[in-house]
Curated annotation (Swiss-Prot):
Belongs to the peptidase C56 family. This is Uncharacterized protein SAR1965. It comes from Staphylococcus aureus (strain MRSA252). It holds the Pfam family DJ-1_PfpI. InterPro entries: C56_PfpI-like (IPR006286), Class_I_gatase-like (IPR029062), DJ-1/PfpI (IPR002818). Residues 3-171 form the PfpI endopeptidase domain.
Length: 171
């Protein structure tokens, strides 16, 4: 059975941090499913990429997926603003159950809401690192960091390393 990767996404995502990992995963034979506020709605990247949401967060069941991808940009901030905290709850399933969880740039912000970062080693874009540290994570400045089931990366320049590692984690 082909593995499925959930991608949680909102407006103002960093286009390349969505499209590049998605392409790498699909080229490796994995299915990707975009999860957002409402199925069949559209979300737009910071540079104009338009993406149709496949499954609404209210209908999404984390146990249906083999991994979670959280692209950066301002999308994670919008997702954290969900008044019901559904995206943090969704991500918590992955972190608590040792299911592969991939986050780049601002993406690790969502992981703060899982309350599962204490003692974890992560990286992220510079202006998110203090928040991760305050949540109990050990933060390093490396292109890609693997801590058990969580893979994090900093910026678009790190995408080659990030993509290689997330595909490796699922093979």
């Amino acid at each position: 059975m082909t593995k499925k990767v959930a991608i949680i996404l909102a407006n103002e995502f960093e286009d390349i941090e969505y499209s590049s990992p998605k392409e790498a995963l699909e080229n490796a034979g994995f299915n990707t499913v975009v999860i957002g506020d409402t199925a069949n709605s559209e979300v737009f990247g910071k540079h104009g990429e338009k993406v149709t949401v496949d499954v609404g967060i209210a209908e999404a069941k984390p146990e249906d997926y083999d991994a979670l991808l959280i692209p950066g940009g301002f999308s994670p901030d919008h997702l954290r603003g969900d008044t019901e905290g559904r995206y943090g709850t969704f991500a918590k399933y992955f972190t608590k159950n040792d299911v592969p969880t991939f986050a780049i740039c601002h993406g690790p912000q969502i992981l703060i809401d899982t309350d599962d970062l204490k003692g974890r080693t992560l990286t992220a874009v510079l202006n998110v690192r203090k928040d991760l540290s305050n949540a109990g994570a050990h933060v390093v400045d490396e292109s890609v960091v693997v801590d058990n089931n969580i893979v994090t990366s900093r910026v678009p320049d790190d995408l080659d390393d990030f993509n290689r590692e997330i595909v490796k984690q699922l093979q």
